[in-house]
Amino acid sequence: MSDELTTTVYYDEDADVSTINDETVAVLGYGSQGHAHALNLHESGVDVIVGLRQDSSSWADAEDAGLRVETPDVAAGEADRVVMLVPDTIQPAVYEAIEDELDAGDTLQFAHGFNIHYGQIEPPEDVDVTMVAPKSPGHLVRRTYERGEGTPGLIAVYQDATGNAKQESLAYAKGIGCTRAGVIETSFQEEVETDLFGEQAVLCGGVTEMVKAGFETLVDAGYAPEMAYFECLNELKLIVDLMYEGGHMGMWNSVSDTAEYGGLTRGEEVIDREGMEKILEEVQNGEFAREWINENQANRPAYKQYRDAEQNHQIEAVGENLRELFAWGEDADAETTEAPADD
């Protein structure tokens, strides 16, 4: 099996922040990603305006951090590069408010390609449309930058009206610290489809359902809920950390032979590959996107029901009680509050 990379990775030496030093960058949103992008760019010598609603609770925070703040339309009107860092669901409305401020040669930039790929935003042909996407929560983008490090990221060019879209995207990625760790070149389609599939089938959907099913199996069989929680949820972090640091083999080499043999011989029994293929197909053909767009237009009735069911699951109460009893719970709960939604 070849170990050669199939994608291009760029680092600091491949990018020059001065490429965008003569630009004004409007960062729309000041939540998890927005605050990190704005502050990191500002400290990299880039002229930044933060675009927020006048009643935004983040307005004062951004000003206190030394940033200039304007409404989105004003920020976009003064900017050469408009960076959409508000949630996907409100981006079309924000774009409608700022689209007349885009001039030929400007750049419309995203951190996720959902609205471009699925046609919710259709930019004019005379602007660059790009993506710079850190593969990390915003608070880590900021924290690692302050330490002189960075988080990996992606760049993509959807529309290159100026001929400079790629180099300027790399410059932006360097400005927020991503080229310190490495930036992969991809496409809007690939980023969106792999991201949605990963979230649904593995990272957010698959893992949580597997944890709940394991917890329920043990509790239904008469085992203590606290033991079920430790075995199926708490220890998951330990295993994922090993995989993150050393891949699957790094994990297998760190667990007992009994755990390794049991995992290798039984793990496949809990995986539904046909279900995974169906999830991917619904991402690729736009079925999931249409469902999610319609759900938002209907004020999220199903979404709210699913969230209520999660909140009321026994594993939540058991976990809350255990986290109050053990020191690691304080760190875990604090970590979940560090990344507010973009405003």
Curated annotation (Swiss-Prot):
Transmembrane segments: none annotated. It is an enzyme of class 1 (oxidoreductase). Its EC number is 1.1.1.86. Pathway: Amino-acid biosynthesis; L-isoleucine biosynthesis; L-isoleucine from 2-oxobutanoate: step 2/4; Amino-acid biosynthesis; L-valine biosynthesis; L-valine from pyruvate: step 2/4. GO terms for biological process: isoleucine biosynthetic process; L-valine biosynthetic process. Substrate binds at S256. InterPro entries: 6-PGluconate_DH-like_C_sf, KARI, KARI_C, KARI_N, KARI_prok, NAD(P)-bd_dom_sf. Residues 187-329 form the KARI C-terminal knotted domain. It catalyses: (2R)-2,3-dihydroxy-3-methylbutanoate + NADP(+) = (2S)-2-acetolactate + NADPH + H(+); (2R,3R)-2,3-dihydroxy-3-methylpentanoate + NADP(+) = (S)-2-ethyl-2-hydroxy-3-oxobutanoate + NADPH + H(+). Mg(2+) 1 binds at D195, E199. NADP(+) binds at Y30, G31, S32, Q33, R53, S56, S58, D88, T89, I90, Q91, G138. Mg(2+) 2 binds at D195, E231, E235. The keyword Signal does not apply. Involved in the biosynthesis of branched-chain amino acids (BCAA). Catalyzes an alkyl-migration followed by a ketol-acid reduction of (S)-2-acetolactate (S2AL) to yield (R)-2,3-dihydroxy-isovalerate. In the isomerase reaction, S2AL is rearranged via a Mg-dependent methyl migration to produce 3-hydroxy-3-methyl-2-ketobutyrate (HMKB). In the reductase reaction, this 2-ketoacid undergoes a metal-dependent reduction by NADPH to yield (R)-2,3-dihydroxy-isovalerate. Belongs to the ketol-acid reductoisomerase family. This is Ketol-acid reductoisomerase (NADP(+)).
